[in-house]
Structures are given as structure tokens and as C-alpha cells.
């Protein structure tokens, strides 16, 4: 199964996900969840504004769909500056980055999504820009080539990544602020779902919002996507009002269970339990057993299963926990 085909994929793959931008928080006071990140950023932003400085460079990492782009927009809004957006794969040549940097106004924010995918050539250009606000570029070719320095206005680079471990040390060390986004708690997601329902003009009970939040895998992007599908079900099968029962019916129909697992999650866990007797099983064997790429398992399927205590990574391989066995109503084997 392709990741983009999953209803509970946290990737931005659907046109309606773009519409979520209209309901995203624009200021820190509207930002729900991530209390430690919010309180720290409030202090850092106020301090930078008091000094009249650009905010220090910021690295945001964590699983997809948790609001890295939203936080970048909030930082720019709070600082009262422009936000320029790009992504690592788009910046193929040093000239691409140079063009963006030379068009920045003082204190502007440059947001680079998937910053771990920057090419080494582009990354080299970024180092002096981050550290000294200078751009070193080569003019000409061969023996006639020469290096010139261009002064840049003070700016803030915000890098976002789902794979912080893939960043090179020189790049990672140049970020003065590093923030990790965690999966959201159900009460915070419930607030987000209720807020989105109001923006969409839906009539939704508190327990209906809670039911959607419980199955959203701790991820706001997934919560909003599930809300739209529940809305469709409520409008076609009922009178449009969303209660807990209607939300549960809709999500059951979509094969999203009470833990927020879909077909692929259950397939992975059942493979570990049925084919490998609960594990441990190596990643390559597991990938072959369920017909998925190992990168998909590591980056997409595993993080939430591990965070929720259904799967363990051990030196010998992946293991299903007692909670995973119980989820399927299967008696776990006796421990020796």
C-alpha cells in the first residue's frame, strides 16, 4: 500500500489538507498543545523583539503532521516579518539558495522544510549565511574563478525535519534553538477538532470531538482529515450532527479502529505476532513479510506504534508487546 493512500497518513497529500491552512493558529496564544515549546518560544521571541534582533536560527523536528510549518508561520507572525518558504529537495543548486537569501529583508524568516535533504553543495553555502550573515559565491569558472562575499541582512532560518538524525553535525550545531514536537494528547486534539468543526460550520458534540481525537494518532493533520470524513458520513447517513456514536460508526466504516490503527498498522503487528511468534524479527524480514519498504516501516508505521507501547525496538529486532497481543484478543506466550 502506498503511504499517500492511507487515510491516516500524516503526509500532506490531499488537496483538502491545503485548506487546513485557513484554520491553523496564527499566533502563540492560539497555539494548542506542545506546552514546553510554546512557553520557550514565547520567551525567545519576546527577548529578540526587545533587543531588536532577528530570532536565533530554529530547528523543529518530530513526526509528520504535528505542526512544524504552522509553528514557522507563528514565529514569523509574532516577529512581524515576512516568511519565505522552500524545501530541501527544491534547492538543487547553490544559486537557488543564494537567490532566496539575497531577497530577504532584515529579520525575515526563511523556512526550509525537509532540511535533511539539502545537497552538500547547498549546505556549504548555508554555513556562512547562518553564522556570519554572509554569502560566499564563486564567480566564473576554471583559473579565472574567484570568490566574492555578499553581506546579508540578519535573518532567521527555520529548518524542519522528520529525521533529525540525518542532519550533518555542522548544520545541526548552527541552530541556536532546537524544538522537538511530540504527539498530541487527546484533550488537546479534542480542542483542535472542535475548533475545526466550528470553522467548518458543523454541529458536533464534545464526545463526538473526543471520539475523533482518540483515533487521530496524536496528530492534528490526521484529526482534521478524519473530521472531514466523519462529516461526509454524518451528512449522508444522518442529519449532519456529529455525536460520539456517529463518529464511531464513520471511523469503523473507514477501518480506523479505537487505537487509531488502520489496515497497515494491524498488518504489521499481526505479522510480528503470527509469522514471527511475537518477535524479535529483523527489519528486512518484517519488510518482506508485509510487502513494504524498510524506510516506510521506520519512518511511517513504527513511530506511533512504539510511542503507544504496541511495538518494541530491541538490539535483536522488533517485538510485539503484551498490549499488542491483547489488542487482537490473542493470549501472549508465557515468558520463560
Curated annotation (Swiss-Prot):
Where does it localize? Answer: Cytoplasm
Where ATP binds, per the record, is at 23-24, 65, 68-70, 131-133, 174, 184, 221
State the Gene Ontology terms under molecular function.
ATP binding; ATP hydrolysis activity; four-way junction DNA binding; four-way junction helicase activity
**Residue numbers spanned by region Small ATPAse domain (RuvB-S):** 185-255
Q: Which GO terms describe its biological process?
A: DNA recombination; DNA repair
Top-level enzyme category: hydrolase
Q: Which domain of life is it from?
A: Bacteria
The EC code for this enzyme is 3.6.4.-
Residues annotated for Mg(2+) binding in this entry:
69
Q: For binding DNA, which residues are annotated in this chain's numbering?
A: 294, 313, 318
Record's catalysed reaction(s): ATP + H2O = ADP + phosphate + H(+)
Q: Where is this region: Head domain (RuvB-H)?
A: 258-336
**Region (Large ATPase domain (RuvB-L)) location:** 4-184
Write out the GO cellular component annotations. cytoplasm; Holliday junction resolvase complex
Listed A to Z, the keywords are: ATP-binding, Cytoplasm, DNA damage, DNA recombination, DNA repair, DNA-binding, Hydrolase, Nucleotide-binding
Q: Which cysteines are joined by disulfide bonds?
A: none
Major place of localization? Answer: cytoplasm
Family label:
Belongs to the RuvB family.
This chain's function reads:
The RuvA-RuvB-RuvC complex processes Holliday junction (HJ) DNA during genetic recombination and DNA repair, while the RuvA-RuvB complex plays an important role in the rescue of blocked DNA replication forks via replication fork reversal (RFR). RuvA specifically binds to HJ cruciform DNA, conferring on it an open structure. The RuvB hexamer acts as an ATP-dependent pump, pulling dsDNA into and through the RuvAB complex. RuvB forms 2 homohexamers on either side of HJ DNA bound by 1 or 2 RuvA tetramers; 4 subunits per hexamer contact DNA at a time.
Instruction: State the HAMAP family in the record.
Output: DNA_HJ_migration_RuvB
Subunit structure comment from the entry:
Homohexamer. Forms an RuvA(8)-RuvB(12)-Holliday junction (HJ) complex. HJ DNA is sandwiched between 2 RuvA tetramers; dsDNA enters through RuvA and exits via RuvB. An RuvB hexamer assembles on each DNA strand where it exits the tetramer. Each RuvB hexamer is contacted by two RuvA subunits (via domain III) on 2 adjacent RuvB subunits; this complex drives branch migration. In the full resolvosome a probable DNA-RuvA(4)-RuvB(12)-RuvC(2) complex forms which resolves the HJ.
- How are the domains described in the entry? Has 3 domains, the large (RuvB-L) and small ATPase (RuvB-S) domains and the C-terminal head (RuvB-H) domain. The head domain binds DNA, while the ATPase domains jointly bind ATP, ADP or are empty depending on the state of the subunit in the translocation cycle. During a single DNA translocation step the structure of each domain remains the same, but their relative positions change.
Q: What is this protein called?
A: Holliday junction branch migration complex subunit RuvB
Q: What is the lineage of its organism?
A: Bacteria, Pseudomonadati, Pseudomonadota, Gammaproteobacteria, Enterobacterales
Q: Which gene encodes it?
A: ruvB
